[in-house]
């Protein structure tokens, strides 16, 4: 029998267990796919015992550009996003190459045209 370790994600300002993360099923993100995301590769350096994110600033700029096209406002600075990603990766204790999905989504109740409130999750996968 395989016993998987509980994973953590960052959701709207809090690091939570994946099994406890909740998004409203009637939110525009669930009803209409109202979200934008970036997948960021991180590479483990065994000699330095460190994970390194690949082209982080470029990924964040694309995330901002995607949100702008969708008329969503990212409520966080690039520096905050980097800090949140580091916190989330550390909470999981990864010592291997990983990908980190960072997703901005339209939360709450709304229609196809809703652009707020904007929620976010960061999920190492």
Region spans (language model):
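Conserved alpha/beta cores of soluble small-molecule-handling proteins
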Residues: 1-125
């Amino acid at each position: 029998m395989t016993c998987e370790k509980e994973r953590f994600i960052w959701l709207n300002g809090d690091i939570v267990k994946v099994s406890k993360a909740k998004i409203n099923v009637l939110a525009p993100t669930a009803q209409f796919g109202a979200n934008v995301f970036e997948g960021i590769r991180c590479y483990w350096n065994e000699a330095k015992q460190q994970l390194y994110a690949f082209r982080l600033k470029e990924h964040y700029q694309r995330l901002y550009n995607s949100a702008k096209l969708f008329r969503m406002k990212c409520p966080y600075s690039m520096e905050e996003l980097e800090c949140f990603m580091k916190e989330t990766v550390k909470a999981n204790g990864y010592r291997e190459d990983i990908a980190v999905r960072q997703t901005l989504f339209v939360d709450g109740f709304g229609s196809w045209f809703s652009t707020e409130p904007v929620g976010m999750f960061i999920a190492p996968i």
